[in-house]
């Protein structure tokens, strides 16, 4: 039997989330996840983008990956003092100001009928809206990519009208 120890195991949830404080979790030995407090919205995401710009210049950082109102930071080496990393991330979060990343508009064709719209009747039943109303509401919105997914070309979008949200 091989005995091992994990000095990060007790720090799985290093800083709990509060109304105004970000949450930092240890994700393995070299990675930390900062989650923005509050709602999933553009305000929080813009601060995540600003934080990503700030930490990208840290000499000891291998990579930073912005997610949906969170930021994963991966260090080159296992940090000697995880608490210092947490403090550093929280300080950077507190100093992060909202930025708006420039992008481009991409029009995505949507097929609302036939074999591609198998969930449309269920959405109409859940929302109480007609199929025409669902299509109109969905089509009128402008969606913003908050983060890139793990599959090529997959973006996590924000901006769905709550009337057509389906769990």
Locate predicted features.
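Conserved "landmark" site that anchors the functional core of diverse proteins
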Residues: 1-167
